[in-house]
C-alpha cells in the first residue's frame, strides 16, 4: 500500500530580502511593515483597533480575549494580489496593502481588511478555550489551527462575510453578483443538496465557500433572529470536539427543527427576497444568445467591440485556460452576425489579467497582467500589455511601474492608474509608442480610483471613498465630484460618444448606465432578470453582455430598439433587506438603535460606544535576528517527519516515538523548522538510544538553505571490504552516529499568465561519521533543473503542454531526468512521459543510488543499481462521477483512470547466485483507478485514494524475483499485483 501525506504549518511566500522593517504597536496588535510606510501602517493599526470590539461582539470573543499577546500583523506592500490571511501556528495576520482593483467592494481597502480579517482573529480565539484551551498546553498553537477543521472554510469565511456586511454599509452581502448563481439555479429547478452546494463541483457552476457560507449563516441569523448563532456554534465545538455533526445540533437548538427542515427554510429566506426584488424590476428586456451553447462549464469576461462590430471576449472553460476570442461583426456595426459558429480564437491571455480596453486609433487592446518576481513571492507588478488586432502581435508596453485599467486618452497616449506602495495613487499619461510617462495626475488620499476614462479635457475616475463609489473628474488642477459616492459598485467606466457608460449594481442587479456629463442625467440602459457580468455597446447601438447561465456564463445581445433606457435618480439605490437586518442586529447587540436607512448614508458603520482607537507606540526598527526563533507548537513525543511525508504500512509503527518536539517559525516565514529529542530501543540489541534532531530552513536570502542533523540515532558504524572473501563487514562502535546534510538552492520561477517556467540550481553536502574503508564519508551534490509548461485547466490532471529537465551530480553518480506533457485524445486527458538515466562515475563497494530505477510495480524493492535508465508513460483520463457523497463523511468530485507503463534497463554487479544484482530489463504495466475527495471522514481537505493493478516482467525479472520474492504480487511467478493508493494534503 502506497500512502503520501503532506502536512506542514503555514509558510508564506517571502518578501524581498532588501527591505528594512519597522514596527508599531497597540495593546492588541503589532504591525510589522517595510521602512518608509509609517503612515500606511498607522492607518491599518487604527482600523484594526477600531473594529476589534465590533467584529467580535456577535461571536462572544474578540482578538486578545483568550490569547494574551499582541498579534503580529505583517504588511506586504509589494504584492499586487490584494488579499489578507489569518493563521495560527504561528499566530499572525498578513495583509497585502495594495487595494483590491479587480472587483472591489464599495468601502476602502483598509476597512475591508480590518472587518473581514478582524473577524478571523476573533474566530481563532476559540482554539484557546474549554477543551481546546487545555490541549493548547500540550501541543501549543497547533491546537487553534486544528480547531478550524471543525467549522471549515465554509463557516469561517461565510461568517467573516456576514461581519463585513453587517458592520458596514456595503460588503459582499450587498453586492448583486455575489449570490446571483443561486438565483438562476433556484429559478431553473437546480436544487442541489447541502453537500453539493457546500463542496462545490469542478464540472457544474458552483459559487465558492464565501458565497454559500454567507447564504447559510445570514439566512440563519435573519430567519430565526439569531445574531449570536456563531457564538453558540463555536462554544459548542470547543466543549464537544468529539461531535462530528456540531452544525446540525446547534442549528436544531436555534431553530427548533431538524436540519432537513431548517435548511430549506434558510434558502427560502433568501429566495423570497430575490423573487420579490425580481418582480419589482420587471419588465425585462429581451435578449438573444450569441455564444455557442455548450455543456461544459464556461466563462465569458472582458468584452470589447471594434468599429466593425467584432466582439472580443476572454473565454475559459474547465478544459482550457483563458484565451481571447473574436465573434465577427458586420460593416454596419452589427455585433455577432457570424453567429456562434463564427467564434475565432486569437491568443492565450491567462487568468491573472485586468480589464481589457480597446484603443480605436491604433486597433489595440490594452490590459494589465500580473507578473510575479522570480524569487520573491510577495513581490509582483502589473505590466501594461498590448495586442495589435490586425497583425496579431502581442507586446509589453510598460514594464517598470505597476498599472491598472489602461485606457485610450488620445491618439498618442493611454492613461492608467498607479497604486503606490506607500499608499495613495496617481493617474499616469503614457506615450503609446515609447511606454514613457509624459504626465502624472495626483489623486487625493481620500479616493481610490478603480476605473478611468478620458473625455477631453477631463480624466474621469470611478473611485472609492469612505461613503462608497462615486465618479470624479479632473483637468489636472483640481478634482470635482459629478456623481456622489454611495454604497454600490461601479465597473467598466468608458467614454461613449462624449457620455460616460458604466456597469453598476445600483438597482440590485448589474446593469448598464449612461451618464450625460453636461446635463447631469443618468439613464439605465439595460434591465434583465439576472443582470450582466460585463457590458459593451456595439457601433449600431445594440448591447452585448454576458450573464449567468446553467453552465457558467453566456454572451447575449439586445437590439438597440429593445433597450430599457429610463432615467433614474442615483441616490435612490437598492437596499438589501437581509443585509439591513444583519446590521440592525449588530446595532442591537451594541446597545444602540440604528435605523437601517442611516446605515446607507455616508460611511456609518455599526460599532458601538467607547470604541475610540487605543494608544499606539511610535515606529521603531524591527530586528529580524531578535525575532528569528519563535517557538509556536510542541509535542510530548517525537514524530518522524520524513516518515509522515512518505507513509507506508511498513513504517506506520515507526512514525511516533518517545520524546519531545518543538516547532519554530518567525512571523515573516523566512526561518522555520523543528528540533526534537527521541528515545528509542534497538529491538535487536535491546539498547536505548537518546537522540537529537534538528531540521531548519532559511529563505530570507536569494538562495534557500536547508539544514538537517541527526545525532545518536544509532551507533557509529565502520565498513571494511574483504577482497579474498568478496564480503563487506560492518562493525558497530560505541560512539554515537552523526548524520548531517546542508542543501542550498535558488528557486527561480516566472509566470506570465500563459506559461510557467523556472530554473532551480542547487548544491548540497552530506556528512556521516560512519567510516567506509577508513574514510569519513563526505558526499557532495550539485544540479540544476528547469521547466516550462502551460497552466493546468480545472478539469485536467496534467498541463496541456510542458517539458522539464534536471541534471544532477550526486557523488559518485551522475543522473539526468526529463519529463514532458502532451494532450490526450479527449478534452481533459493527457500523456506524461519521463526518462531518467544514471551512471556511476567512480566504483564503490557501498551501493546506494541517486535515482530510483525500478518500475513502480516492484514497490519498495531493496536492490539498487549503479547504472541504468528508466522510461515511463502515464495516460490520465479524468471523468465526472456526479459529485456523489456518503452522508457528511465523504464527498467525491471526480475519478481518474491512468494506464501506465514503466521500462527499465539496469546494469547489475554480477549473477544473483553469488549475491550480486542481475542485469537486463524490467518492466511494469498496469492501471491506476483513483477517486478525488474534497471531504474525507468529515475532514475537508484534498484526498486521493484508489487501487493499482500491475503486471511485472522483463528479462531480469526471474532473477530479481528469485532473490527477493517480496517484490512480486500474486500468482505462481508473482508477476501480477494489486496495491492501494492514498494521498492527502493538509
Predicted features, each with a name:
Residues 11-16, 86, 90, 105-113, ...:
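Acidic/His/Gly-enriched intrinsically disordered linker/tail segments
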Residues 283, 296-298, 302, 566-700, ...:
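Outer-membrane beta-barrel initiation region
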Residues 7-146, 152, 160:
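Juxtacatalytic substrate-recognition/specificity segment
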Residues 730, 771-918, 957-974, 980-986:
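C-terminal outer-membrane beta-barrel translocator/porin domains of Gram-negative envelope proteins
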Residues 173, 177, 315-324, 348-354, ...:
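A flexible loop/linker signature enriched in serine peptidases of the S9 family
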Residues 276-299, 327-356, 386-403, 420, ...:
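Multi-bladed beta-propeller domains
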Residues 12-15, 20-23, 204-207, 231-357, ...:
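Beta/coil-rich, acidic/histidine-enriched accessory regions frequently appended to metallopeptidases
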Residues 510, 531-533, 550-553, 685, ...:
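Outer-membrane beta-barrel translocator/channel fold
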